[in-house]
């Protein structure tokens, strides 16, 4: 299971205010003034509160291509952040498959926007695709897999999300991708979902070699919790 020391899960259609864990240890013999001082220092400089933003309330500046999925918002040292996910529509291409039928291409999107005193601007657009598929395209975000954390305690939040995609004719593992994003740094895990105990393996990107403490454990823990593709049905 994933350790709650490093992050808190966000599930769609819910609101969670994330708080820093309280300090443990023996408090016996602590004076009233010392206790008050400890309480003050335990308050984080930035309280990363994550909430689901209904479609009608997601700012119009937060554009998303094709089929809009959801919008989430949190605040950190850089200001108010928005994360929007969407799914492209399958497009028929000029390529032909082995059977002579047209093939299709489909894209999946994720957008990170930031709101400051100057307005809302796009920080990153993330895009992936299945290209020239002559069979069935199966593609979607893993909707319950969205997390906002501050594992390195630098007051700049990281967010984590996952999606799956494949071109297939049967029930088999899909390509599965997990991303942790902090500022302009992206840490990627790629592999296969697990279907009927087949698949589930993954590979960490080389960027994890110099990742902050906790990032690797965070990524592998989430992967293990969400690798079962059939568990979504």
Model-identified regions with their sequence ranges:
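Beta-propeller blade repeat segments, especially FG-GAP/WD-type strand-to-loop junctions
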Residues: 105, 109-124, 170-193
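Surface-exposed loop and turn segments in beta-propeller and other repeat-based domains
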Residues: 123-138, 196-209
């Amino acid at each position: 299971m994933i350790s709650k020391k490093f992050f808190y899960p966000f599930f769609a259609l819910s609101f969670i205010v994330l708080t820093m864990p309280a300090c443990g240890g023996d408090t016996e013999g602590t004076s009233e003034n010392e206790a008050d001082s400890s309480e003050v220092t335990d308050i984080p400089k930035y309280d990363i509160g994550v909430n689901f933003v209904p479609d009608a309330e997601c700012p119009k500046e937060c554009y998303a291509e094709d089929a809009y999925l959801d919008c989430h918002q949190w605040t950190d040292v850089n200001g108010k952040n928005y994360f929007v996910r969407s799914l492209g529509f399958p497009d028929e291409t000029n390529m032909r498959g082995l059977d002579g039928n047209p093939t299709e291409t489909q894209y999946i999107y994720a957008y990170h926007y930031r709101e400051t005193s100057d307005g809302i601007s796009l920080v990153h657009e993330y895009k992936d695709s299945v290209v020239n598929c002559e069979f069935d395209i199966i593609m979607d975000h893993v909707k319950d897999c969205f997390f906002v954390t501050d594992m390195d305690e630098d007051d700049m939040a990281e967010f984590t999300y996952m999606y799956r995609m494949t071109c297939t004719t049967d029930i088999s593992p899909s390509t599965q991708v997990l991303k942790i994003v902090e500022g302009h740094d992206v840490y990627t895990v790629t592999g296969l979902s697990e279907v009927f105990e087949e698949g589930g393996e993954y590979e960490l990107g080389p960027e994890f070699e110099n990742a902050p403490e906790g990032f690797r454990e965070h990524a592998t823990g989430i992967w293990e919790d969400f690798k079962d593709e059939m568990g979504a049905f």
